[in-house]
């Protein structure tokens, strides 16, 4: 029997609709004859004329032909590549409106995904001092395009299939973002330019580092060119031929100081990191976020605090300046090792770090059984902290500060804490970690009733 496939004929002509909301990827949403239609580069409240570009059983896609009514929140995108490059999704929306939208997204998801959870107070949003040049971490694709006769370096196009042809990136730190053309031209001089797949960028307080992911070996001449490029631009260059364990630093060579990249999360603390380690992309907001987390924990000198999903100690080490003891727990052993080294290098003696998978049972772990805590900080990845929240009564903590990069996961976990574990949501708010994108960084405070 042959397979039957659903085929819908694309509607022809020009249609009109009002945009009522934004999708998770920043496209405008309109309801046309009861069916959801996604229309890019539109904002809620706008009325547009459009034509269909794609249709499926449950939704349609379209493009704007004319703006009949424009939103007061509409601005001219600061980047010439905005409509092509997929790196940003909200440059056509004022930064104030972006924050308001993200704040409302948080409140809505707490209510609907968290089954009625509402914060007693809305925290004022943490704003960044610069919505351009803020991004210090990125993975940039590299591809030789024969039709264009050149190397492309950048993010994928909005459709996700090809790399966008860009000459600069305004959200990347300008030490890299202003040099996209220079970097792509340099790669063209290498013998294996068609076999370089990716550049992983990490920028500390003073210098950029670049991991060059290559699929074929470099020649000696290539290596000399890479060293010269690094020296001329004050870059640290790393090479990666296969998995993460193959990464090594090509330039500078030898036992140089400093041995690692580093940043200061708070006064008096230097955290060393490798370019493939997880660090926050926005240094300005990171410092403000840490300060806010410490304020919301309401730390006294007798507090014992546990920091789960602690990474390199981004929160743990600054918290240690205010608390009696702090324990950091992280799933990646390499990061735990670096966190311990950082504590030693900064002469911090009231912290300790442990490696543990926090997505499975941890009741047999030393850090769980041999210490008592009265407060907790959570900073999980996008998956959230469901296992921890399901077992929160075993920690017996009075206050929880939860930092989240995924509002849906936070809302789910808030529902667990508030509806089944006897906590109340004191306050919640957003932080402008990712301007011009739909990514939402948020923070919430829970207190035991």
Curated annotation (Swiss-Prot):
It catalyses: uridine(1939) in 23S rRNA + S-adenosyl-L-methionine = 5-methyluridine(1939) in 23S rRNA + S-adenosyl-L-homocysteine + H(+). [4Fe-4S] cluster binds at residues 79, 85, 88, 169. One of its GO terms (biological process) is rRNA base methylation. Residues 1-66 form the TRAM domain. The keyword Electron transport does not apply. Signal peptide: none annotated. PROSITE patterns: SAM_MT_RNA_M5U, TRAM, TRMA_2. InterPro entries: 23S_rRNA_MeTrfase_RlmD (IPR001566), MeTrfase_TrmA_CS (IPR030391), NA-bd_OB-fold (IPR012340), SAM-dependent_MTases_sf (IPR029063), TRAM_dom (IPR002792), U5_MeTrfase_fam (IPR010280). Keywords: 4Fe-4S, Iron, Iron-sulfur, Metal-binding, Methyltransferase, rRNA processing, S-adenosyl-L-methionine, Transferase. Its EC number is 2.1.1.190. Gene3D superfamilies: 2.40.50.1070, Nucleic acid-binding proteins, Vaccinia Virus protein VP39. Coiled coil: none annotated. GO terms for molecular function: 4 iron, 4 sulfur cluster binding; iron ion binding; RNA binding; rRNA (uridine-C5-)-methyltransferase activity. It holds the Pfam family tRNA_U5-meth_tr. The active site is at 405 (nucleophile). S-adenosyl-L-methionine binds at residues 280, 309, 314, 330, 357, 379. It comes from the Bacteria. Belongs to the class I-like SAM-binding methyltransferase superfamily. RNA M5U methyltransferase family. RlmD subfamily. Catalyzes the formation of 5-methyl-uridine at position 1939 (m5U1939) in 23S rRNA. This is 23S rRNA (uracil(1939)-C(5))-methyltransferase RlmD. It comes from Francisella tularensis subsp. holarctica (strain LVS). The lineage of its organism: Bacteria, Pseudomonadati, Pseudomonadota, Gammaproteobacteria, Thiotrichales.
């Amino acid at each position: 029997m042959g397979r039957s496939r659903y085929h819908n004929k694309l509607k022809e002509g020009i249609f009109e609709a009002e945009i009522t909301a934004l999708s998770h990827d920043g496209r405008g949403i309109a309801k046309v004859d009861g069916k959801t239609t996604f229309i890019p580069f539109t904002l809620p409240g706008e009325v547009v004329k459009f034509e269909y570009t794609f249709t499926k059983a449950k939704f349609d896609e379209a493009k704007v032909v004319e703006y009949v009514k424009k939103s007061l929140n509409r601005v001219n995108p600061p980047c010439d590549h905005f409509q092509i490059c997929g790196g940003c999704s909200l440059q056509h929306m004022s930064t104030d409106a972006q924050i308001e939208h993200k704040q409302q997204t948080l409140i809505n998801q707490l209510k609907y995904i968290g089954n009625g959870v509402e914060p007693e107070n809305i925290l004022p949003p943490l704003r960044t001092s610069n919505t351009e040049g803020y991004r210090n971490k990125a993975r940039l694709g590299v591809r030789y395009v024969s039709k264009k006769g050149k190397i492309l370096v950048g993010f994928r196009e909005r459709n996700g299939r090809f790399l966008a042809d860009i000459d600069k990136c305004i959200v990347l730190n300008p030490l890299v973002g202003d040099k996209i053309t220079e970097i792509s031209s340099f790669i063209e001089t290498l013998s294996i330019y068609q076999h370089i797949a990716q550049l992983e960028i990490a920028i500390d307080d003073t210098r950029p580092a670049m991991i060059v992911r290559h699929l074929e070996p470099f020649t000696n001449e290539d290596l000399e060119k890479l060293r010269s490029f690094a020296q001329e631009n004050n870059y640290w260059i790393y090479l990666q031929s296969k998995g993460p364990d193959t990464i090594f630093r090509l330039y500078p060579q030898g036992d140089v100081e400093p041995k690692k990249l580093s940043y200061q999360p708070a006064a008096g603390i230097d955290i060393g990191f490798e370019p493939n380690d997880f660090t926050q992309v926005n240094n300005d907001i990171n410092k403000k976020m840490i300060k806010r987390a410490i304020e919301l924990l309401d730390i006294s000198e007798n507090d014992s605090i546990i920091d789960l999903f602690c990474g390199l100690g981004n929160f743990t080490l600054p918290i240690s300046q205010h608390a009696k003891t702090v324990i950091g727990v992280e799933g990646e052993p390499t990061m735990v090792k670096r966190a311990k080294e950082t504590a030693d290098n900064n002469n911090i003696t009231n912290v300790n770090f442990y490696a543990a998978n926090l997505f499975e049972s941890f009741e047999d772990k030393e850090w769980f059984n041999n210490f008592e805590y009265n407060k907790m900080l959570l900073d999980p990845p996008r998956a959230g902290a469901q296992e921890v929240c399901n077992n929160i009564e075993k920690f017996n903590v009075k206050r929880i500060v939860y930092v989240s990069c995924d509002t849906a996961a936070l809302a789910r976990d808030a529902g667990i804490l508030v509806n089944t574990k006897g906590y109340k949501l004191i306050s919640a708010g957003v932080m402008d970690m990712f301007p011009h994108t739909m990514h939402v960084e948020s923070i919430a405070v829970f207190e035991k009733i």
